[in-house]
Amino acid sequence: MYQRALQDPLSDTLRAIVLAGEPEPVANDLPEPRLPQPYIKVIGARSMLERTWERIERLIPAENIYTLVSERHLSNPEIRRQLSVRPPGTVIVQPENKDTCPGILLSLMYVRSRFPETGVAIFPADHFIREESWYIRYVSLAAQALADDPRRILILGVVPRYPETQYSYILPETLTDRSPSIAYHRVLGFVEKPHLSTAITVVRSGGLWNTMTMIFKG
C-alpha cells in the first residue's frame, strides 16, 4: 500500500491532517485503560487512530500525513507508543485542546509554513469505516476535483441509512457536477446532532451524513 501511495500523483500535491486532539478519556467496558476515543482499540489490535493512518496511507505516504494531538496526551504511555511510529516532524502538539476549528487552524499553519502550495485533506481520527476501499476512492476523486479547480472546498457526505441523532448532517443544495462515480453539490448548511424528529426531517429532505472529511487548498 505504501508503494502505491508513492506512485500516486496525489502523493506530491496533497497533505493530510488527522485530528486526534480529543482531551478526555471515553468511558467504556473495554479491558484496556480509559483513553481518548482515537486511541481505543475497538476491533482487533489496532486503535481507531492506527486504522486511520493505515487507511490514508493507501493514498498519501506516511511522511505527508500530519497528526494533531493535545499536549496532555503525551503523558500516557499507550498514546506515546502509538505516536512513536510516525515519521519525524509529523506529530503536531497543541498546548491545550480548543475544539475542532482552532485545531485545524494550528495544523494548517504548521503544514502551510512548509508547503505553501499544497492541497490539504482533513480526516477525523475516530471514525470506524467498514468499506475503506470505497472511502479512499471518493477521497481520491475529491482530490482530483480540487486539482481541476483549486477554488473548491470539498466535504464528503454519505447517504444516510437511518436518522442518526449522534451525527452531523450536510444540507446539500444544487447539483453542480456529476461524474459516473460521484455527484457534487453546493452546501446549503449543516445540522449538528439533531433531535430524532429533526433528523428524520433532514434525512427525508436529502440531508447527508457528514464524514468530516474535507479537502481544499486556499
Residue ranges, per PLM feature:
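Conserved core of the sugar-phosphate nucleotidyltransferase
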Residues: 132-218
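A secondary-structure boundary/capping signal
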Residues: 124-125, 217
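Conserved N-terminal catalytic core of the sugar/cofactor nucleotidyltransferase
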Residues: 1-36, 41-124, 130, 134-136, ...
